[in-house]
């Protein structure tokens, strides 16, 4: 795996990526084929499911509403896990709209095996 900061930067940027092909390729690089992305109200499984999840979030929050996702603070990781906080705010600037954190469990190949997403606000 590349260093944690680079990995997290790529992870955050995928949620802002407008190009579907670039999203698809990056998802395959970051997630294992049978990975799970879990949030309180949904479960996305495998590359196709995760691609749909990310594309849906992009369409709703970035493209339609003009927001951007970015890292909030530092990241931490050990024993094959990464913890990061993120925030969503208008791309043009303004107040933070939403805050959350993701906890990523990595496989032996350094790709995400399971990602847990928690919306805090």
What are these regions (language model features)?
Residues 59-121:
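A beta-strand edge to alpha-helix "cap/lid" segment located at domain peripheries
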Residues 1-10, 50-54, 110:
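Short charge-dense sequence patches
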């Amino acid at each position: 795996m590349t260093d944690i900061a680079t990995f997290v930067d790529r992870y955050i940027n995928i949620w802002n990526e407008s190009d579907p092909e670039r999203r698809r390729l990056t998802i395959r690089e970051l997630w294992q084929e049978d990975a799970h992305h879990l949030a309180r109200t949904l479960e996305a499984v495998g590359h196709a499911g995760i691609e749909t999840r990310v594309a849906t979030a992009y369409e709703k929050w970035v493209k339609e509403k003009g927001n951007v996702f970015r890292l909030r603070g530092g990241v931490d990781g050990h024993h094959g896990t990464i913890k990061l906080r993120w925030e969503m705010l208008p791309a043009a600037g303004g107040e933070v709209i939403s805050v959350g954190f993701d906890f990523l469990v990595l496989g032996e190949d350094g790709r995400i095996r399971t990602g847990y997403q928690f919306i805090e606000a």
